[in-house]
């Protein structure tokens, strides 16, 4: 339902490809405590995507991958914070959903490519016979780092039409074609976490409370108090209320 995926579809249609639009249904807003509209799985976003698909004369489908998203993204996200690790759920979503489950659907439906609105580029090295994942031209929007897990087989069947464009060019194309989402804001936060408050999300999602406790060094000295283990990660220095020379 975003402007980037919409323009990616437009560019592929203009190249003469037969395209279909797809939205991955990953969760119900109420299941993850979201109340706002225009999340990636809201009805509004589905309707935006459907509108663009209609304008481009493409069939459009919604695939329900909620069970896999819960297991491979949300549950892993929660477990990471519970163990003091900083997760990146966007990497897991790409790895297990977009380029696994959606990739499987591409094969089943006899299409040749999964096309997304990611800002990244794919090149083929004739000398090594390998596909290369490269940064986008727009370095401010580059997303190649969240695509590191793509295999050679996946890279062979993936296209990123926006990799050679600036974001302003993408919006201009969307406006020129009167796309309903041409001025839609870019998503900044984790899609299933409201207002960026991951700790509140984890407590709501798990039904657990993570009580405050002591910061203790390796010698058993109490250095201060923390506000609950999920609010901190290994190596963190800022926001601890403790002045130390090293993490």
Which positions does each model-derived feature cover?
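ATP-dependent adenylation/nucleotidyltransferase module used to activate substrates
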Residues: 1-148, 159, 169, 175
């Amino acid at each position: 339902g975003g402007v980037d995926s919409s323009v990616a579809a437009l560019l592929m249609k203009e190249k003469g490809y037969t395209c279909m639009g797809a939205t991955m249904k990953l969760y119900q807003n109420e299941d993850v405590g979201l109340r706002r509209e225009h999340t990636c799985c809201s009805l509004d976003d589905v309707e935006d995507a459907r509108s663009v698909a209609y304008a481009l004369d493409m069939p459009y489908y919604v695939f329900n991958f909620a069970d896999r998203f819960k297991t491979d993204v949300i549950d892993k996200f929660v477990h990471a914070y519970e163990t003091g690790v900083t997760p990146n759920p966007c990497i897991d979503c790409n790895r297990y959903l977009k380029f696994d489950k959606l990739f499987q659907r591409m094969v089943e439906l006899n299409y040749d490519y999964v096309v997304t609105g990611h800002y990244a580029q794919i090149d083929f090295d004739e000398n090594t016979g390998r596909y290369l994942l490269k940064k986008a031209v727009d370095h401010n929007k580059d997303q190649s780092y969240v695509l590191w897990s793509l295999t050679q087989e996946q890279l062979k069947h993936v296209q990123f039409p926006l990799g050679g464009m600036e974001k302003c060019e993408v919006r201009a194309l969307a406006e020129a074609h009167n796309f309903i989402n041409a001025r839609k804001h870019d998503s900044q936060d984790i899609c299933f976490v409201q207002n960026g408050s991951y700790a509140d999300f984890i407590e709501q999602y798990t039904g657990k409370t993570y009580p405050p406790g002591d910061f203790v060094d390796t010698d058993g000295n109490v250095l201060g108090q923390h506000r609950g283990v999920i609010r901190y990660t290994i190596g963190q220095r800022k926001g601890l209320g403790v002045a130390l020379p090293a993490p």
